[in-house]
Amino acid sequence: MSITKTYNGDPTSLVPTQSVKESLRLIEDLKFFLATAPANWQENQVIRRYYLNHDEGFVSCVYWNNLYFITGTDIVRCIVYKFEHFGRKIIDRKKFEEGIFSDLRNLKCGADAILEPPRSEFLEFLFKNSCLRTQKKQKVFFWFNVPHDKLMADALERDLKKEKMGQRPTTMAHREPALSFHYDESSSLYTQLGKHMETQKRINDAATSSTSNTATTLTDTGVSSGLNNTTSGGGSDSATSTHNNNEASTKPSNGSEKSSPEYTTTARGRDEFGFLNEATPSQYKANSDYEDDFPLDYINQTTQNSEDYITLDANYQAGSYANMIEDNYDSFLDATLFIPPSLGVPTGTAATATTSNQVAFNDEYLIEQAQPIRTPLPPISSSTISGLLQPKSAAKFFSLQSANGGEEFFPAYQNDPSTANAGFVPPISAKYATQFATRQVATPTYIKAIPQTGAAAATGNGGQPQQYYDQATGNAFYPAEIPVSYNVVHPESEYWTNNSGAVATTAAATAPMYDASGFPIPINQSYMVMNEHEMVPYQYMNSNGAMIGMIPPHQQQQQQQQQIAMGYQSMLRQQQQQQQQQQQQQPSSTMTKKKKQIHSFNNNKSLSSNGGGITKKSHDNNNHSKVKTSYGSLNDVVNSKVTKVINKEEVKQSQT
């Protein structure tokens, strides 16, 4: 009977108590993270996360511009997580979040948060790290300015008041400790919630101690040899267990009733607060696979284990392959691999220099893609280029040569007839595994043709062969036909040669721009815009419309066109000025004529009154004898001397 009294119930009755204890422990862990997340960060750490569950994900503490931030989305996640472990199930998530965001409006910008513009760099960083659901303009809160417990208490108070009023709440109690919580409107819900959480913790601690005492009693019973000893031992253990439970129930709390439950739920002595200086408390590290932090949060510079951490460096290369090479890649390849034998240090014999490793390279490959050739190929003469070793499109390699001797790439072994270079095989093309020509340069120079009219597209102007015009030198030449026809306008990804030294010689060995019977290919040329059709110096439209046939104009023709255009514009200006002067002079000329008539009448009258005599003929008579002359053109009117003289006389008379 003593065993039954000591056990005090069946094992199934302790399962809900264990779940409540686990829920309270998870709430304590989250509160501890919210209180100590900005402490003990690594050197390059920018974010620290706490995993909630599969539905809510992570809560992140972000370090940005020397400050620690938390988003409103993460605040809602924390409150939802606490409600679930408190025993209340969320039935209307949208209304629940609206109430929390309404409370967050009390946290003002500047004092408790910052206002970020839409799609800013900070919001983009938060969005990529799943701290936000959108990049709209919003507030991001300072880490220590968010009252998490007060926000949870306000959300719970809204639901409890709705339940009393008969309205539909956003959450519903479905298990402990929410089922045993009774709301008293006369006191603060914040204080009531703290008391209730502390009471639940004491009850679970008592149940845990009772379970441990029962297990000890059962063990002692199996070891003892007599039933009396077992019964007496069980009675003593039962008495001890009862005494411990009474002490646990009457033990006073270290925190006050008005303090936050974040600090009152865990009762610790003053000597037990050394964990605040540690990265992780020792009680959480014991008997668990606890890691230092989330692996994506920072760069671990002490170890080279790339499986544990993901670096923020864009140029980082994981694996042992990248770590064994220096930053400048000097230790990856031998530097003497790319040095010709003639420039290397002689070792006493020419054979040693000849057998050094050769490198195949050309313009199509980077230096990192160059590969050494293990077996040097024998020299190939230029007479065998039309054989089977060369592709058909490679015939132009040897038909175009440069006048500078090809000293850009191989100055050592081509012009030096020494014994060291006597047996050296020239580098070969990595694309065709064939040799370069002796005087070849791999710099392309494009040859552009002068477009002709459609009727003379085959033979050029006047039955002459097709002309080609080099824009670099300004020379025209006539190409010769060779067996290999090649399209110069659309070259393949192969070599071209430089024809700066000998334009005519190069063009003579080049394939034509297009066949005589083929369709002409238009070439991009600069357009000449003419506003007036009379000023076009030559016919510029083609009959067939396939291409524009224009000969490159000479400098004298361009100067003549410019002079004609300038003369035409000046003539228009003179006409406009002359018309304006005539309009202004019409009213003034009528006034001067009237004044002249009055003046002449007064003179004649005064002479007749004086008794007559010989008088001088007045100049006014000339005005009556004027003859209006008609000029043939506007230039005659402008350059007329008669008009200028008459105007001068009228001005003098008007002044007198």
From Swiss-Prot:
Molecular functions (GO terms): DNA binding; DNA-binding transcription factor activity
Record GO cellular component, one term: Tec1p-Ste12p-Dig1p complex
Main location: nucleus
Ranges of biased composition (kind: Low complexity): 205-242, 575-586, 600-609
Pfam families, A to Z: STE
Keyword flag Nucleotide-binding: no
Superkingdom, natural source: Eukaryota
Cellular compartments annotated: Nucleus
Family per record: Belongs to the STE12 transcription factor family.
Role played: Transcription factor involved in the formation of pseudohyphae and hyphae. It is likely to play a role in the developmental switch between yeast and mycelial forms. May be involved in a signal transduction system, strengthening the possibility of a sexual phase up to now undetected, and similar to that of the yeast mating pathway.
Protein's name according to its UniProt entry: Transcription factor CPH1
Organismal lineage: Eukaryota, Fungi, Dikarya, Ascomycota, Saccharomycotina
